[in-house]
From Swiss-Prot:
Protein name: Protease HtpX homolog
Localization (cell): Cell inner membrane
Record organism: Campylobacter hominis (strain ATCC BAA-381 / DSM 21671 / CCUG 45161 / LMG 19568 / NCTC 13146 / CH001A)
Keyword Lipid biosynthesis among UniProt keywords: no
GO molecular function: metalloendopeptidase activity; zinc ion binding
Cofactors required: Zn(2+)
Enzyme class, broadest EC rank: hydrolase
Amino acid sequence: MEQIKTFILMTFLALIFMFFGGLIGGEQGVIIAFVVALGMNFFSYFFSDKLVLKHYHAVKVDENSAGGLYAIVRRLANAANVPMPSVYIIPEQIPNAFATGRNPNNAAVAVTEGLLNLLSENEIEGVLAHEMSHVRHYDILIGSVAAVFAGAIAILANFAKFGAVFGGNENNRQNGILMIVAAIIMPIAAAIIQMAISRSREYKADAGAANLTKHPEWLISALSKLENYAQNRTMQNATPQSAHMFIINPFSGVKSSFSQLFRTHPSTKDRIARLNEIKQSM
């Protein structure tokens, strides 16, 4: 079922890419966008995880270099009945975490140094249980594919702005308004896609974490600390295109009506409320 969802997502994003390619370059733009979309689908499926990990300078660790962290991930992988994922630490002092990969057999979980310094061992386990739930539910591929396409859509939007401003011939000038509209709409379309993908899967992963650890309060405490920290600081190298992958939106501290309207995560208050309901039912 999750593979079907991923296929639908990749097809939908390719169609959006082709539509805006047509607005910018007519029939030739559609053809170019189609070829690029095919290449991006292939690239996203096999390499999106590596791209995201490289962007955040994630360092792979093992049981010798990070024994405690590795042991927690191994324990959760066994509980979730999934293969042991690769484990990475991001040299970043803002606490956060994400999972990536195309399937449970090729998964990776990454945490920042700041998260390891801020949270207790139980809270770290709650966060990692959340990420392992993403792995088990195949959310990781969908999130990685969406991140790559959102980045490409942002690039296409910049091309549209360039074409609208610097188009030299009469036809380009006549299409200038369409290009400007495309440049405005494309990032919004990318944000809506990320929002639709992320909000429901975060609730699902929170519930999965509670089920894996049998201690919802671990994740409740972790989310509260992470949210409080994120309100005052923003991650270095964080991009809006990959924000939906993190357990807490790295741009939580950015206060604007636009960012609130298109936020990629449900509110931490609502997530904690749902976890408290799960706790009471245990």
